[in-house]
Amino acid sequence: MTTTSDQNAAAPPRFDGLRALFINATLKRSPELSHTDGLIERSSGIMREHGVQVDTLRAVDHDIATGVWPDMTEHGWATDEWPALYRRVLDAHILVLCGPIWLGDNSSVMKRVIERLYACSSLLNEDGQYAYYGRAGGCLITGNEDGVKHCAMNVLYSLQHLGYTIPPQADAGWIGEAGPGPSYLDPGSGGPENDFTNRNTTFMTFNLMHIAQMLRAPAASRPTAINAPSGTPAAGRTSPTPTTDSQRRSRVARWLVAGEFRLLSHLCSRGSKVGELAQDTRTSLKTSWYLLGPAFVAAIAYVDPGNVAANVSSGAQFGYLLLWVIVAANVMAALVQYLSAKLGLVTGRSLPEAIGKRMGRPARLAYWAQAEIVAMATDVAEVIGGAIALRIMFNLPLPIGGIITGVVSLLLLTIQDRRGQRLFERVITALLLVIAIGFTASFFVVTPPPNAVLGGLAPRFQGTESVLLAAAIMGATVMPHAVYLHSGLARDRHGHPDPGPQRRRLLRVTRWDVGLAMLIAGGVNAAMLLVAALNMRGRGDTASIEGAYHAVHDTLGATIAVLFAVGLLASGLASSSVGAYAGAMIMQGLLHWSVPMLVRRLITLGPALAILTLGFDPTRTLVLSQVVLSFGIPFAVLPLVKLTGSPAVMGGDTNHRATTWVGWVVAVMVSLLNVMLIYLTVTG
């Protein structure tokens, strides 16, 4: 007969909720083979099997500046990716530093990583504790020369000095034949089959998971005293259950750890009293401006060339009639974007990852196919918009303009890939401001009548054509690729904080981020319609974007027309790079595939160049691209509302019931409007 204790003993331990970061300090850039990756795969594989969420990064792939300040761009360096990488460090309960031996010592990359960790060691968290408090650290070393223990002890000393908790047996390594002997993954090395290395790696991995789980446990669940010896009941207890020597040793160890935890808690709770000696993270976060950015990248999708076509057509044909649609669409979009960012912050997963996790492989492939088609249709529209702007400004052939747009957008993506998300956000935000200036500059010449503007806020239609344009505005505003992307942007920028003050703060900042970004995007969309209503109403040559440019030129002058074209160009360039970024995130989240950005750029550029070369009407193509986008809206918005309203997914941060109901209303309404757009377009 199997007892309950036997069943518990047989069940493998689970460490769900823990997150680990492995930093590989190899000197080889990706995709070169790193032998250290072999040991990382063994340890991280064990963690994944037991429920730990694992993140890995190769430090040499990133532009980490030399120095001992949190952000070296504030101390003379042009670029520094460490602030973005540091968020991944803070997101992890377990940090494992891994690297090779060089001349009997750690690599220069390892030393740089430790220096930058040291640079942030005086920062405090929201509870006034030092940043690395309550986290576990370990290391993995590979090489074919003496020094594995020397390197490991240097790393472990550094980690404990910085504030990490180091469990017993917190290191593992493999050392091959000294000299030019084989390295860990070389054929015949015996590295992956080495019992000693595998055993130590397993010990290290489980010790890290156990200590990290204990450090995260609520205080009430931690042991506070050693059990009294058998036969000697402690005060207030009935006679205790007899314990074995191994159980006593285990309890003593847990008690010692708990005592260390209480001592550290007492000391670190006084962190606010030693503010003069340490830089509080709240010093750099005392204003929320530092944390703004992800929503501004997502907002580019709301001012792309498709929006220009829909808004200008609406204003030229119906004046101020459909202004209310723009306002309503942006309010709905703000809710959708906030829910997307919230999902990324709370779960640590992008929307594609969260959806894919709940699907089998055939369903994931089908879902990925529709999402990628939508992302590619978006990218085609953005390239065409940029090509139109270049033809307006420089009289370039449309195919040449498309190539230039594709190349420039690739350069923007390179900024994100090489220089980090923060700089990418700054560049995209700058382009958003250029777009805003380009489409609002006309108000310095002629302002719309206030009464007419207020009249446009009253919901109403004038015939079937106005309904079609309203659906087009809605379809051009709530963009599926922006919904997918924003969840990943928020996670990558802010990390995945544990429940508590830090998460609440980041959610508040996210609401500000979304609110400000959507206010700018909504203002730009409204400006497009108002400019068209004021200057193009009744003209017969505004059916295309180029016709709208000429109308602006004739009514407002060359300067305003040039600014209009510059705004359109910035819209095409920025939205094209953001669309390609979203496509990569969709593929990574659903299929766990990564395609080089250049290859992806060429794939999506091909259809756009073919359309431009074959002489299809560019503006008509933009309209049709919005129809393709309409197919993807329900697949993005409906799962988002379901996931963020699920306590199983969001825990204590699940949507309020009212928010969920409003979310469902918005999701269904947007989906129905897009179905209507498809129907009206197909039926003419």
Curated annotation (Swiss-Prot):
Q: How does it sit in the membrane?
A: Multi-pass membrane protein
MF (Gene Ontology) = cadmium ion transmembrane transporter activity; manganese ion transmembrane transporter activity; metal ion binding; oxidoreductase activity; symporter activity
* Main location (coarse class): membrane
Cysteines paired by S-S bonds: none
GO CC aspect terms? plasma membrane
Q: Is Metal-binding among this UniProt entry's keywords?
A: no
Family membership noted in the UniProt record: In the C-terminal section; belongs to the NRAMP family.
Q: What does this protein do?
A: H(+)-stimulated, divalent metal cation uptake system.
This protein is called: Divalent metal cation transporter MntH
Please give the organism. Mycobacterium bovis (strain ATCC BAA-935 / AF2122/97)
